[in-house]
Amino acid sequence: GLGLLYTSGLLQEVLPELIALKGIEEVEGQTHKDNFYHTLEVVDNLAKASDNLWLRWAALLHDIAKPRTKKFIKPHGWTFRGHEFLGGKMVPKIFKRLQLPTDARMKFVVKMVQMSSRPAALVDQKVTDSAVRRLLFDAGDDVEALMLLCEADLTTKNEKKKRLWHSVAFCGI
């Protein structure tokens, strides 16, 4: 579906924000992944785990603001700080343009986009009970959907990273 839209040129007309994700830059020998292909992989991963249409929209749009937030900072490399929050702000404009519903379904997509990195961030730091409680409180009834999205977003080929994610993410959340 999405691949055909891309090769036909229609994706540029329908969702130019996705096309902006395409490409890899290199600065001082450091590159970042091609976020367009990463996004397609996330959508495919999620489709295997859920038939929730609105969660699939969240997967499609979860990195939509990365081109606007991309910076190279020495010595850390590429960062996309705040892409989740800016992406969440972009969702209503995209939904209105595509004449998608702007009701609770859109609000769910906004919430998932804005929270999409939160569970993974817990893996990168010492997990405290209060951090887990905040995540659960903020996610509310959507915690299972959020975890499915985060699992789908784990496209790394690094097996050590995958094991770390699973050991933290699924031990009681």
Ranges and model annotations:
Residues 2:
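Active-site pocket-lining segments that scaffold enzyme catalytic pockets across diverse folds
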Residues 20-21, 35-173:
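C-terminal subdomains that position terminal phosphate/3'-OH groups for nucleotidyl transfer/ligation
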Residues 26-27, 43:
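Short catalytic-site patches enriched in acidic/histidine residues
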Residues 12-19, 24:
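Acidic catalytic cores of enzymes that act on phosphate-bearing nucleotides/polynucleotides
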Residues 5:
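Residue-level signal for inorganic ion chemistry
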Residues 9-13, 116:
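Core structural elements
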Residues 28-33:
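Glycine-rich tight-turn/loop motif centered on a GG-T
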